[in-house]
């Protein structure tokens, strides 16, 4: 009877156990079939298996992320795509970001299944799918954040020269998707690097651990083009926005002082600018979240390729993996807090959410939207 039970279990690697007296220490990969071991970097096979409770805790955490991200990003896509007042060229980038964030959460069921089976349960095929989804959504979100920064930069620093049209916004979004494609296809086809399990063997990413020149070159290249480039663009655009706002306010105060008046702004101008600033703050917050969530992962991959690999324990590498997914869950709620017109639509369509948006700022955002659409019609 015992022989029959043991036959149904996946065979263990001979080196997968260490015995010390009556205690047994299992290593990662102890429950992986022999034909799947070849896909796991040797670094992880030398690491101790974490307690089962850690797997289960991460599985439950990802269940929460999956539902929160699906609900939040689903509502953003629904409202931004069906509300006429929100259907503007600028919001095409917000919609694109929500799509990338939604795609990011679609790989959560793979992680959840692996976690509750304590390892590389679904095998290499689903590992490739998991990593492909992660590469597309992560790199795409970064480049979309840069595009949002570019758009906000033009809206706030060049209010009389808004040249963003639907055609231009769609083309920019298509370029973003095309930009992401090589970083998925190259490791997926193993033409350059490969996708492999990482950490607790429940998630997958590009190989940053193999000790060869090609791996180091790939890690350095993808780090530059998928993290450094969008980060530099984001920092440039938002630093220009902040500088413009401070200089503009300073100029208005000085002019008002010369004219011996309290302020040169009308109530309408104040309301309109408040709405624009709130939208800019939302964009800045999301870009900050992108930077905070992806920096640990970038540092981890650089350590794996160029540094001391002993620093990369399974538990340590799971933290950056979780922060990357967390930002996809938070993004839509940042807009729910900060975007006046989106809050107004939420209040109208989902009154049970208890959103209370003042009509003044939403109306000013609406007038800005109308002005944009009028300018686009004139340009056409």
From Swiss-Prot:
It comes from the Eukaryota. Disulfide bonds join 127-204. Phosphorylated on some or all of the serine and threonine residues present in the C-terminal region. It is a multi-pass membrane protein. Residues 361-380 have a biased composition (Low complexity). Glycans are attached at residue 6. InterPro entries: GPCR_opsins, GPCR_Rhodpsn, GPCR_Rhodpsn_7TM, Opsin, Retinal_BS. The modification N6-(retinylidene)lysine is found at residue 325. Residues 80-91, 151-168, 246-281, 339-380 are cytoplasmic. Residues 1-54, 115-130, 194-217, 306-313 are extracellular. One of its GO terms (cellular component) is membrane. Residues 359-380 are annotated as: Disordered. It is found in: Membrane. The keyword Phosphoprotein applies. The chain crosses the membrane at residues 55-79, 92-114, 131-150, 169-193, 218-245, 282-305, 314-338. Keywords: Chromophore, Disulfide bond, G-protein coupled receptor, Glycoprotein, Membrane, Phosphoprotein, Photoreceptor protein, Receptor, Retinal protein, Sensory transduction, Transducer, Transmembrane, Transmembrane helix, Vision. GO terms for biological process: phototransduction; visual perception. The keyword Transport does not apply. One of its GO terms (molecular function) is G protein-coupled photoreceptor activity. Visual pigments are the light-absorbing molecules that mediate vision. They consist of an apoprotein, opsin, covalently linked to cis-retinal. Belongs to the G-protein coupled receptor 1 family. Opsin subfamily. Each Drosophila eye is composed of 800 facets or ommatidia. Each ommatidium contains 8 photoreceptor cells (R1-R8), the R1 to R6 cells are outer cells, while R7 and R8 are inner cells. Opsin Rh4 is sensitive to UV light. This is Opsin Rh4.
